[in-house]
Amino acid sequence: MAGNTEIVYGMHAVRHALQHSPVYVLELWIQNDKQSEQAIRDIMQLAGTTPVQYVSKQAMNKLTHYARHQGVVIRKKKTQSANIDLTSLLTSEDETIPLYLVLDGVQDPHNLGACIRTADAAGVKAVIIPKDRAAGLNATVSNVASGAAENIPVIEVTNLARSLRALQDAGIWIIGTVNDAGTSIYEVDLNRPLALVMGAEGKGLRQNTRDHCDMLVNIPMAGVVESLNVSVATGICLFEAIRQRR
């Protein structure tokens, strides 16, 4: 796809795009043998005058690299949130205490999509990810995020440490999560402008990222496992911040 367009597949993600950003949708692809299904007919009704192509299952599989597309795909312009930069976001006014999510090198697109979906549910102002050595925004991420990737700014940065310093200069407190921290996240006041930093699967936070955090915390673990899936850990930490703010 061209640099300013992307594909989105799966019922939830496609429905969200058609409902919330229909002007960005350029084309709709429907799998031939699914035209009569009610869910597909509902999608087609939402699409209105959007051009529709009916294609084979084989063509759909090729288009989505054999992902679980459920017989429906759209091609759309990237939304404005994809073009927001960190500087403009930090200078914008906040109606509530800002909460950011920073992901340090999450490489699995399914985990990235799940983290973005959780961040959207928690009311996070933006998700910040590195451009290199990490999963980027793609159709798999959009599908797993179920529309959240089109609703919440996801900012890809070239230098994560520099971005953390920019957050600090804007008065944002940086908390990193690591297994060996001496303080539990439940012991910390999260009712302040905050950026929560989560590490990659298995590796955790890089040392340079740890060095740029104001504080390191852990999630208390009672069982034999040493760590949680990053999307699960993200949900625990974000909603602890939300709990404290209510």
Question: Where is each model-derived feature located?
Answer:
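N-terminal positively charged helical leader segments and presequences
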Residues: M1-T91
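Short, glycine/polar-rich helix-capping loops at beta-to-alpha or helix-loop-helix junctions
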Residues: A39-I40, A134-T140, K203-H212
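Short basic, glycine-rich beta-strand/loop surfaces that mediate nucleic-acid
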Residues: L63-K77, A145, A149, P153-V157, ...
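RNA substrate-binding interface of SAM-dependent RNA methyltransferases
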Residues: V23, T91-T183
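Active-site/ligand-binding-proximal alpha/beta "capping" segment
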Residues: I175-V225, N229-S231
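Short hydrophobic alpha-helical runs that function as membrane-insertion/retention elements
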Residues: Q53, A126-P130, N218
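Structured adenosyl-cofactor binding patch, chiefly the S-adenosyl-L-methionine
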Residues: A121, S142-A148, Q207-R246
